Regions:
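Extracytoplasmic/secretory soluble proteins
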Residues: 2-3, 11, 15, 19-527
Length: 527
């Protein structure tokens, strides 16, 4: 009994101290203050407006800072922002939020005086971010410019759940119906998918089962690892390190890319992959799940209201040469350029703007920004885990996607959030099974080195952004043509593909990476 009283006293004291700390921190201003924010939003947000997000409404009350939101759809955000910057007669917003703006563009805008260097203001006005910046070395490599500038703040991810986004999700009913073990190799996977394709596991008497569904990018990024490709993680396509030689390479030039294309062609032509993957991707996954047709999914989380019917596995699929990399593994940075202050922000409001966003880099502020208001949208259960409240769950309709549901409460869906994603942010999303999966993938299947987002010089960036994109698009288009039967993969077509690739001068891309990686890791270091 005495112990229980002591625990209760400690908890009460902690809560009181926490409330005191928050009371001292807020409001952020002594008089009414307004910030104008241009934000990128997706269709899953209520009326496509961040104004309607409950966590942000609550934060306006707490901070005393009123936000005039300019919500711009993600389909036109880039063009809209570029047009406003190009029009010298248009006043820019104080802040550009969730833009996922690349370092090369940030550096260019910074040199032109369009955006503000945040570095001089951070230590005093953004202590939460400054602490992360000094504790996690990959952050500085990702956001610090050539002369020490910091033009924008990133989305930081510390939890394994967010660092290993693409996982293989299996439908429990489908697996029980075919009576087979979970696949551990590509050969196993083919056998399981074939059995599912022919099973009528949903029992409706129709051959309407969807085997594996994914976006085209998730498909590539997941299966590359089974062929020893893309061995330096999620932030860098096209260039990696050969796991056998340790040399930099453009991995589309390796023979294993041919093996990959051959395997995926067989999967597609045998209808073991969703046939509209190149046109619809995974957009219909929730619909197929609701109609009891979906068997497997490559995604961060289970589809729709998957519940206990979906589970994931703690390994990557082993390929023909023994590779089983989980190449869709991130460093501590999800994306850069998610909080940018423009030249039109009044100088006296720059500290206020940074204090406003800095709360999102604390554990309490992160939860508010991403999943909403504690006690109203989510709660801490007796076992210490976090879960949606009954009130929040009551808003969910059968046809509502995970993103649309979460977007009512916080800015999580769509990414590009200037915040820190801590581990087990919400156990309703990342319960024991997917959390264990993420930990296992990060520990046992991630490449031995994950390249962070890199700040390239202007010359390097010109090569990486243009040539890298051209090569990536060329290779993926070749794979799609072969998979769909538009082109047959023979020795001659493979040789022609390699000849065209060589004409694109991939050595320039490798040289740019070698120069940048030497700055990151040091002269003579292993990349």
């Amino acid at each position: 009994m005495k112990l229980n009283r002591l625990v209760a006293l400690v908890v009460a004291l902690c809560l009181m101290l926490g409330c005191t700390a928050i009371a001292e921190q807020f409001p952020l201003v002594d008089e009414p203050t307004t910030l104008h924010i241009m934000a990128q939003v997706g269709s899953y947000y209520p009326d496509q407006k961040l104004d309607n997000v409950h966590g942000l409404q609550k934060y306006e009350e707490m901070s005393g800072v009123h936000i005039e939101w300019d919500n711009v759809s993600n389909s036109v955000f880039g063009d809209t922002l570029a047009a406003r910057i190009a029009d010298s007669g248009t006043k820019l917003p104080d802040i550009i939020l969730r833009g996922k703006i690349g370092n090369d563009k940030l550096a260019s805008w910074g040199e032109q005086g369009i955006i503000v260097d945040l570095r001089p203001y951070l230590e005093e006005n953004a202590p939460n971010f400054w602490k992360l910046f000094n504790e996690e070395p990959t952050i500085s490599g990702a956001i610090v410019g050539a002369n020490g500038e910091i033009w924008g703040l990133p989305q930081v991810i510390l939890g394994a759940e967010m660092r290993t986004p693409t996982k293989l999700w299996l439908n429990r009913n489908a697996m029980e119906a075919i009576g087979m073990d979970d696949p551990k190799t590509l050969d196993d996977y083919v056998k399981v998918m074939t059995a599912i394709r022919d099973s009528d596991w949903n029992g409706n008497g129709e051959n309407d089962e969807i085997t594996t569904i994914a976006s085209a990018n998730n498909m590539h990024n997941y299966f590359y690892g089974s062929f020893g490709l893309r061995t330096r993680g999620a932030h860098h396509d096209v260039v990696d390190v050969d796991p056998e030689t340790g040399e930099l390479r453009v991995y589309f030039q390796h023979e294993n890319f041919r093996k990959y294309v051959e395997f995926m062609t067989m999967m597609y032509q045998e209808k073991l992959i969703y046939q509209e993957i190149f046109t619809e991707g995974d957009k219909q996954s929730d619909v197929f799940n609701q109609t009891n047709r979906l068997s497997m999914l490559l995604n961060t989380i289970a589809p729709g209201n998957g519940g206990d019917n979906w589970y994931t596995v703690n390994w990557s699929l082993e390929g023909p040469d023994g590779y089983a990399f989980h190449t869709q593994t991130r460093g501590a940075i999800h994306s850069t350029g998610n909080f940018v202050i423009t030249c039109d922000c009044p100088e006296e409001l720059i500290p206020v703007a940074l204090k406003w966003v800095d709360y999102f880099y604390s554990e309490e502020g992160s939860a508010l920004a991403l999943i909403g208001v504690e006690g109203e949208d989510w709660e801490v259960k007796e076992d210490g885990t976090r879960s949606w409240t009954d009130t929040a769950l009551a808003t969910r309709t059968e046809d509502m996607s995970n993103d649309a549901f979460r977007a009512q409460f916080g800015m999580w869906p769509g990414g590009g959030v200037p915040a820190c994603f801590f581990s087990n942010l919400l156990d309703a999303e990342y319960g024991p099974i997917p959390s264990a999966c993420a930990q296992a993938l990060l520990k046992d299947y991630a490449p031995k080195k994950i390249w962070p987002i890199i700040t390239f010089t202007a010359d390097e960036s010109a090569v990486v952004s243009q040539l890298g994109s051209d090569i990536n698009n060329f290779a993926k288009n070749f794979a799609a043509q072969v998979m769909t039967g538009e082109k047959e993969l023979t020795d001659d077509t493979w040789a022609a593909f390699q000849d065209e690739l060589a004409k694109m001068n991939p050595e320039k891309l490798i040289d740019a990476y070698e120069s940048a990686l030497t700055r990151v890791y040091g002269e003579g270091a292993e990349f």
